[in-house]
């Protein structure tokens, strides 16, 4: 566009009608003119629309403070109080950063993302915590398995493919996907074998960590909407990952030994503090520092992009019993609802719940193993109950879980046997 000279007196703004003499500048386009005052007005309107769009349902944390987030987590996740507090603060800061009013943004202060790394044994609730956070915040959520990822050019899933499932969870709404949460499970499995840089290509380890860096930090990635490898004829969708919250989780078996060695080096001699040797694996994970993750095999750049470290403790028998009974979607409540559909009241005794917890601990599967234990114990009665009539109550006691006995059935006036 050209600026109109002072001599072109016949020209006027196509929007407000002011002449060249009435404005400071008049910009010319093909058969159209716009003055500097209309340009300023347009800028103000655009700014109002940007702020307004955040007020029209885009804000993720309407009035939710960290205490509220933790309280919501308490409804679904038993125990892990410290981890829930860490996550509540990190999530609150993340979405406040995204939803900050335009007038409060200061170019001199750049608020960086606080991606999260979750440490904890299998079945301690890492995936559940991340999933529940997304549910509380009403944002799209997806889970990716780090062990299936490879560098570009190798057989396996491209790192960018982890964005595809998030896009699908957002019903292909790119704007919603760009504010979602991605949980990358088993991140510990792609640690390099030693903490020294490798001279050879490591398809499933360091190479994948390098590939994850840009996506986790923030980049515009082109992804095939239906997944799979990219090819020239395929339509690609651009996703900006700058505001996607990444939570990486893993059991990190052996990381406790790294922490113990670090603690031991600082206390050598007659006055050495032996407390580190007496701590459990869960207690050692609570003391993890970034340098321990480097020793374990995560590359420095990736550790730097995961500044928030939260550890989850191994669940005790009491924790598992509470998980069976207390959350809003507790397993016992789910089974009770299934029996309610058949018109039967289902009751679990305290002994039966303790027996389920003991079996899950023996299998070293934590909370994840509770459902399989219950499914096995309840198979016969769930097979029979639709064929029985006049059953009013089914009581599951300890022997049903430990010895495979049949539950106690209480009938009404008329009792009907299996045919």
UniProtKB/Swiss-Prot annotation:
Segments forming domain ClpX-type ZB: 1-54
Binding-site positions, Zn(2+): 13, 16, 35, 38
PROSITE patterns referenced in this protein's UniProt entry, alphabetically: CLPX_ZB (PS51902)
Metal-binding is among the record's keywords: yes
UniProt-listed SUPFAM superfamilies: Glucocorticoid receptor-like (DNA-binding domain), P-loop containing nucleoside triphosphate hydrolases
GO biological process, one term: cell division
Keyword Transport: no
Protein name: ATP-dependent Clp protease ATP-binding subunit ClpX
Species: Desulfotalea psychrophila (strain LSv54 / DSM 12343)
Gene name of this polypeptide: clpX
């Amino acid at each position: 566009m050209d600026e109109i000279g002072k001599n072109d007196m016949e020209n006027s703004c196509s929007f407000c009608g002011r002449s060249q003499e009435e404005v400071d500048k008049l910009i010319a386009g093909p058969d159209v003119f716009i003055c500097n005052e209309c340009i300023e007005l347009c800028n103000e309107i655009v700014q109002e629309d940007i702020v307004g769009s955040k007020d029209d349902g885009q804000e993720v944390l309407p009035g939710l403070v960290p205490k509220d987030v933790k309280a919501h987590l308490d409804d679904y996740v038993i125990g892990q109080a410290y981890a829930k507090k860490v996550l509540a603060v990190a999530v609150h800061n993340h979405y406040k950063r995204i939803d900050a009013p335009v007038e409060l943004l200061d170019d001199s202060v750049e608020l960086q993302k606080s991606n999260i790394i979750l440490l904890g044994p299998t079945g301690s609730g890492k995936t559940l915590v991340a999933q529940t956070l997304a549910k509380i915040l009403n944002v799209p959520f997806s889970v990716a398995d780090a062990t299936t990822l490879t560098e570009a050019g190798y057989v396996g899933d491209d790192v960018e493919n982890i964005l595809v499932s998030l896009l699908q969870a957002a019903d292909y709404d790119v704007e919603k996907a760009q504010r979602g949460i991605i949980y990358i499970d088993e991140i510990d499995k792609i640690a390099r074998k030693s903490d020294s840089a490798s001279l050879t290509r490591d398809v499933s380890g360091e190479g994948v960590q390098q590939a994850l860096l840009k996506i986790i930090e923030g980049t515009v990635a082109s992804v095939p909407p239906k997944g799979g490898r990219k090819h020239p004829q395929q339509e690609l969708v651009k996703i900006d990952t700058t505001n996607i919250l990444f939570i990486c989780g893993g059991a990190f078996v052996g990381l406790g030994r790294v922490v113990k060695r670090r603690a031991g080096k600082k206390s050598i001699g007659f006055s050495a503090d032996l407390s580190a040797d007496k701590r459990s694996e869960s207690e050692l994970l609570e003391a993890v520092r970034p340098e321990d993750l480097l020793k374990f095999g995560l590359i420095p750049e990736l550790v730097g992009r995961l500044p928030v470290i939260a550890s989850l403790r191994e669940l005790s028998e009491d924790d598992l019993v509470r998980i069976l009974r207390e959350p809003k979607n507790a397993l016992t409540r789910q089974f009770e609802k299934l029996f309610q559909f058949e018109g039967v009241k289902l009751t679990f005794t305290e002994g039966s719940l303790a027996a389920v917890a003991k079996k899950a601990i023996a299998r070293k599967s934590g909370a994840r193993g509770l459902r399989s234990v219950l499914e096995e114990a309840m198979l016969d009665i769930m097979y029979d109950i639709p064929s029985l009539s006049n059953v009013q109550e089914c009581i599951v006691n300890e022997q049903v879980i430990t010895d495979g006995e049949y539950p106690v059935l209480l009938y009404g006036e008329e009792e009907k046997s299996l045919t």
